[in-house]
Amino acid sequence: MSSSSALQPVIPAKPLCTPDGKVSHDTSSGTLAIKRAFQAKGILLADGFLSADGSLLADGSLLADGSPAAQSVDTVPVINEKDIAHRFSKAANQYNSIASIQRVIAEQALANLPHRLQGQALDIGCGTGIHTQALYRKGAAATGVDIAEGMLAFARKKYSDPIFIQGSVLDLPFTENTFSTVFSSMALQWVSDTGLAAKQIARVLKKGGVAELAIMVAGSFDELKTARKVAQLAQADMVMPTAAQWGYSFKQSGLSLQRVITKDYVDMHSDIMSLLRSVKGVGAGATGRKQPPLNRRDIKKLAMAYFNASGVESKLPLTYRVSHFRLEKR
């Protein structure tokens, strides 16, 4: 971890239930606030998260019947897989040194799995293979799949035991009912079709198999979006599906939702360039439309707006909102 950044996983505090069924979480000394509205059926766990049969009403992203609310055309992500593959391939050699917050999130997701695994395990969006190797150490016959050949070349060179294959989650190159475990951490936010991705995961899972998925969702990078707005800069194209949209897609695929927990992980940076490099270095924002580069004046305006809005002295927070899904194929 570089000296310019520090990690702070932020877990929502004890929830407060309002009379209309809303649950409010206050985090990070009031500088960040998470608000989620739930259908008032009493299907709330003690920690404020939904039980498996709950219907989420997250800022209108799901209607009362559990179906997704309509999105306007300009809020639908435009994903270019070739662009994403190219960006991640370029980042392969430096990815492990930059992606410190990704490691924290993946370690949490791996900790959610049993200590020992049996059968075959798939790591979707395996990147440099570090987490595929962790699945292998848990006892699984591990396979990593990624769209970025540069990442796979790095993984094959470093790890000899897992198998690494190029492929997309939208068209997984495996037969039905192959894997007892499917794992993915910080990769599925780049998906353009959550429904198709969910169906592919369900297809390759064996009956009784489990998927443990950590997915960055809408609400991530809000500080950066706010600072860009205050600085009157064009918004970067970083639209992500909501946790509710993913939940609906998994339900439609036939997978059983066992648990979903959404956490804010906050990466602290000492300056704006460190923050922007961390976003670019891990391939974030590779969603299709090109953005004009920031000039020196833009960067100065952005830094000033960020410091004024962050409320954290001498540090710039960047929030990764991640939903940890546990799914089962019955």
Please place each PLM-identified region on the residue numbering:
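A short SAM/SAH-binding and catalytic strip from SAM-dependent methyltransferases
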Residues: 181-193
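A short acidic, Gly/Pro-enriched loop at the edge of an enzyme's catalytic core
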Residues: 170-182
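Conserved class I S-adenosyl-L-methionine
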Residues: 35, 73-116, 130-134, 151, ...
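A short glycine-rich, Lys/Arg-flanked "PGG" loop and its adjoining helix->strand segment in the class I
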Residues: 195-210
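Class I SAM-dependent methyltransferase SAM/SAH-binding core
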Residues: 120-172
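N-terminal, positively charged/glycine-rich alpha-helical extensions of SAM-dependent methyltransferases
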Residues: 2-18, 29-45, 68-91
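Conserved Class I S-adenosyl-L-methionine
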Residues: 259-330
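Conserved catalytic/acceptor-binding region of the Class I
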Residues: 210-272, 285-296
